[in-house]
Regions:
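Catalytic glycan-binding domains that act on GlcNAc-containing polysaccharides
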Residues: 79-234
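An acidic, Gly/Ser/Thr/Pro-rich helix-cap/linker signature
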Residues: 2-4, 13-14, 22-124
């Protein structure tokens, strides 16, 4: 939720949803690349000519292109679409290209995601929703956006108050990870009931339900991957 820029220039742009999903898939993709490497027989290894390229595992992009199916909260991501796949590959490469940041993501996940997972399981909601917190705030608990959103779940003041968070000059429960998590999950359930899709619920969480409803009405589609949405939401 860090600085929304409304451009509306390209259809079918992929959103933070892809970034959310790829955080789950990165380790699997990397292991797949290693597992697919040609096996070396130690008995004949010394008899073979040295060819580093022949023994090298497939590139990351080669491993990525083997992925044929991907989903978010049980909803299929259309990886057969070139724009979707290209955005997925771009976001993954950008994430892995910044190794210090990628390491920080992994460390923060160990600290925060288990609690979110437990709450989602208790509420019988999709586990993938935990990655919205990563996309919203990079799991930085005291982060504040230019627009005034605060905390790991990036609640705006009015939205936070509407979902039971105490926000005044002395207390700001948006900074309280546990309390804000409960509020965020309740809000996501409400958005799913309103829009009937977790992809749309994730978009509405980022840009606001009124904004998404207006875009759906204006563009005459409720297909998440066809909607032209704010850059940050996409």
């Amino acid at each position: 939720m860090l600085m929304i820029r409304k451009t509306g220039t390209l259809r079918g742009r992929i959103s933070a949803l892809i970034f959310v999903v790829l955080l789950c898939w990165c380790p699997l993709t990397l292991w797949a690349a290693v597992d697919d490497a040609p096996a070396i027989n130690p008995e004949i290894e010394t008899e073979l000519p040295v060819n580093p390229m022949a023994a090298a595992p497939p590139s990351l992009l080669e491993a990525l292109r083997k992925i044929r199916a991907l989903s978010f909260c049980g909803e299929a991501v259309p990886m057969e679409r070139q724009d979707v796949r290209e955005r997925f590959e771009k976001e993954l490469l950008l994430t892995l290209g910044n190794r210090p940041q990628a390491i920080l993501y992994l460390k923060r996940q160990l600290r925060y995601l288990p609690h979110i997972e437990a709450v989602l399981e208790k509420e019988d909601l999709p586990d993938d929703l935990k990655y919205l917190a990563v996309a919203e705030s990079a799991l930085i608990p005291d982060i504040r956006s230019r627009s005034g959103a605060m905390g790991i779940w990036q609640f705006m003041p009015d939205t936070g108050r509407n979902h039971g968070l105490m926000i005044d000059s002395y207390i700001d429960e948006r900074r309280d990870f546990s309390t804000a998590t409960q509020a965020a999950i309740a809000y996501l359930r409400k958005l799913y009931d309103q829009f009937g899709s977790w992809s749309l619920a994730a978009a509405a969480y980022n840009m606001g339900d009124n904004g998404l409803a207006a875009d759906i009405e204006l563009q005459q589609t409720n297909d998440y991957f066809e909607l032209v949405l704010p850059d940050e939401t996409e």
